[in-house]
Amino acid sequence: MKVNVTVMLKDGVLDPQGEAVRHALGALGFDGVEGVRQGKLIELDVAEGTDRATVEAMCQKLLANTVIESYRIET
């Protein structure tokens, strides 16, 4: 079973990678990009029947730094 976990910096946390991408887009002539937030997508292939609580535990313990990042689980 595939589970996607999207991890993003929380609102208010400085995103230097996103800012660098925004700046580079402007330098390439892509005007109008006012902000970029960069995160990561983690695709898990877990055993059928793995419950959401198990995936939540994975996120809490390893996949996301919950002090500065939020995550979204999609099955």
What are the residue ranges of the model-derived segments?
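Non-catalytic terminal accessory/regulatory regions of metabolic enzymes
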Residues: 1-75
